[in-house]
Amino acid sequence: VLGLPRIVSTKEDFEWIVEQYDSISNGINFCTGSLSVRSSDKLVDIIKSVGHRIHFLHLRNNVLLPDGCFHEYGHIHGVVDMYEVVKALLIEQKRRIKEGRKDSRMPVRPDHGIKMLDDYNRDSNPGYPLIGRLKGLSELAGLEMGIERTL
C-alpha cells in the first residue's frame, strides 16, 4: 500500500508469527488477495505450513499486470488457483475434525465482488456490491461442494 512493504507477506513471516506463541489462539486471517500480489508466494504451501492456525478466510482474487500493479477480479478467476486453495483448506478442516478440534470451521469473507446487474443502481462502497458478493459466495460454495465430494 502506497509503496510500503507489508508486515506479513511470506510463508516465513507466518511461520515466525505462529512460532512466537504456541497457542491455538495465536491465529491467522488468511487473505488470498493480499498474498497473491507477490508471484513468489505459493498459497497452498503457506496453508500446508501454518494451516493449523488459520482461523478466518478472506478468499478473493487478483489479476497481475506487467508493470507489477494489480487489480481485484472475480473470486474464482485470476492468479489464485482457488481450486487448490479451497482443497488445501478442506484437507486442513478434515484434519481438525479428526483431531477433535472444536475450531474446525473457518469462516469466509466473500467481499471484493464484481459490480454487476442491479449493483449499478445501489449505493455501496467499492468492492462491496450486493449481487457481486453473492455471486462470489455462490461460486466459492459450489467449488467447496465439488471438492468435498472428491476427498
Pin down the residues of each PLM region.
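Histidine-acidic metal/acid-base catalytic patches
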Residues: 1-151
